[in-house]
């Protein structure tokens, strides 16, 4: 099966209808509270404002990230969202990155100003400019390097 068939979105806002910070309407597949995470391989926090504070305020999100990180399951965050992982103590002693305006919020982390940073089961990216390498790294982790290479070629990403 492809990654698309096994990917779903969950809303942390209490509504399946989400309006992004850039006024893009998204309909999540479920509310975060409705998901059975036992078969989930990776949790991704998308970041942005007000998305990041909404993620930080959702107990299901924070409990799930903590459980995943502590059990060795994959957790990823981009833009401002790595600050949520830091606030939970999940970046303590780990290499990480975040949007430049949030790097000072990565308490306990070894901060790198790079597109994507992987440390064990935690992957972080600095923001929209790193979204493609971030996504390709997650594909590599879940489906292997051949699939990541195939997608990179298909989207003509030469970075």
Question: Where are each of the predicted segments found?
Answer:
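Extended, subdomain-level signal for the structured scaffold at the beginning of enzyme domains
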Residues: 1-75, 84-93, 105-113, 121-159
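Cytochrome P450 catalytic-domain "roof"
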Residues: 118
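Short, thiol/selenol-centered motifs that function as redox-active sites or metal-ligating centers
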Residues: 78-79
């Amino acid at each position: 099966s492809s990654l698309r068939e096994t990917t779903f979105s969950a809303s942390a806002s209490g509504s399946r209808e989400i309006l992004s910070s850039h006024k893009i309407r998204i309909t999540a597949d479920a509310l975060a509270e409705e998901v059975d995470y036992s078969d989930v391989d990776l949790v991704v926090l998308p970041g942005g404002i007000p998305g990041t504070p909404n993620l930080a305020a959702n107990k299901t999100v924070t409990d799930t990230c903590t459980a995943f990180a502590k059990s060795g399951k994959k957790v990823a965050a981009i833009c401002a969202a790595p600050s949520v992982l830091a606030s939970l103590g999940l970046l303590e002693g780990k290499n990480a990155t975040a949007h430049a305006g949030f790097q000072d919020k990565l308490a306990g982390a070894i901060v790198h100003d790079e597109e994507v940073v992987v440390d064990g089961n935690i992957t972080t990216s600095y923001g929209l400019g790193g979204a493609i390498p971030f996504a390709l790294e997650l594909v590599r982790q879940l489906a292997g390097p051949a699939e990541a290479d195939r997608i990179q070629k298909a989207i003509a990403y030469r970075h």
